[in-house]
């Protein structure tokens, strides 16, 4: 039990949590709220929820902010044990179905120990939709031993791992779209719009042939940079440096996969064909 662990091996951190918004919600009515808790901590300060806000243009905004104290444990190998923040995105449509869970997000707080403040979008897990939640987290140690290791540091934004994953194989997006399409028809128009956007984005990335001798970005980094408003170039390009990307296996692979994706409207058309 943690009560028998020396105080020096139970460092305390001040967690600042900001919940900004959830976007790409395939609903036109209803209210959305987010419940959060810190796994393994049952005190009142370690769980709360945002206000329930209405869906407007497939988005809900809160700008919710809170600050809590979190105690972690350093094990015998001098490793800071994982401590998870869990967020559930819930929807109340004011119907007989009651409150339903749109998705969940599980974040390992130990990854934020050496990061400071960070704000990013995450693709919801355990979900049939492609909604993303934008949150901000900062973690500051206030007491205890600071001589410890962490098992994993914070990597690239998960939402972008999710997006490039969609561009790489498309399996998760197709699975979610299939489930939406074969259910009650909820948000099929939204799902098709989302797929059109992804296919168009992938096609543009392929056509641009953004490989150059002076570009330090690989294909994945090019997509990441364009998604966040960049040009896809590590440095301003020179026309003379642009090379023919016809033999680029990564871009060819993207093009093949892009052609293999099927939109809901295309499914209907195929069913109608003799």
From Swiss-Prot:
InterPro entries membership: EEIG1/2-like, NT-C2
Single annotated GO MF: lipid binding
Disulfide bonds: none
Cellular component, GO, one term: cell cortex
Domain of life assignment: Eukaryota
Positions of the C2 NT-type domain: 3-141
Recorded family membership: To yeast YBL086c.
Protein name per Swiss-Prot or TrEMBL: Uncharacterized protein C1494.08c
Species, as recorded: Schizosaccharomyces pombe (strain 972 / ATCC 24843)
